Amino acid sequence: MYSCKWGLTLKQCAVVFLFLKPLPSFLKFSIMKKILFAVLSLMFISAQAQTVDEVIQKYSTAMGGLDAFNKVKTLKMAGNVSVQGMDLPLTVEIINGRAMRNDVSVMGQSITNSFKDGKGWKINPLAGVSSATDVTGTELNDFRIQSMMANPLMDYKARGHQVELLGQEDVEGVKTYKIKLTSKDDGKVTTYFISTADNMLIKSVSTREMQGQEFEVETFFSDVKDFNGLKFAMTRTQKTEGQVFQEIKYTSIELNVPIDEKIFDK
């Protein structure tokens, strides 16, 4: 019999005795398996808690780095939007974090979205909006996000967003990390798919309101090119219900070029 030592209570001594008492081999093996499983589970949980930030950091680095994007003052992009069999000229002008304007030319008319210092407006003759009309709510927030060059994932903490790693998923044969981002501003959820091989963004999924209805929109990013150390996807293909409804192809990108701020005013 084991006697109580080290000032332990009888109950504590009983627990010690259980560990000291020889156990049958099969029981030892069973206990060891449970301990090993518990340790591995804790290790996995710990790794998961760190992985989402590690994936985002690797993605940010692959794109050129958050600091580098934040140092860019202005951005000009030009290209074409392919929609319903038409190729429409597109221009985008951004003052990083402050202002954004994009123009699409359609049959001699212009569809314009603009944002500056918290206010936004739009013109869309094809939708009956022939003069500059203020935008509010989710649409205004979308314009504001477009004025920021860095992807919301890169500095999600500073913006107050929530992120969650949802595991891995194949996207058209590419193994990716799947990350859910919930916006602090409007609760909108965007899911990002980042390649496990080169840490580049392959696809994003979000909801968009079109003609009074909400649709899930998939955006695929391809033809990535380097401009002064920063990566840009020159082709962005958008699908809903598995069908392509729009494709944007940029033909030129200019960084830190003069932009007249008056173009953002109504």
Residues of each region from the PLM?
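Bacterial Sec-dependent N-terminal signal peptides
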Residues: 1-52
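N-terminal mature ectodomain segment of secretory-pathway/periplasmic proteins
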Residues: 54-128, 164-165
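Subset-of-secretome marker
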Residues: 86-88, 100, 106-110, 172, ...
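Short amphipathic beta-strand/extended segments with alternating polar/hydrophobic composition
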Residues: 90-95, 112-117, 131-140, 194, ...
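Short, ordered coil/turn segments that flank beta-strands lining enzyme active or ligand-binding pockets
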Residues: 118, 125, 171, 196-197, ...
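Gly/Pro-enriched, hydrophobic low-complexity segments
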Residues: 175-265
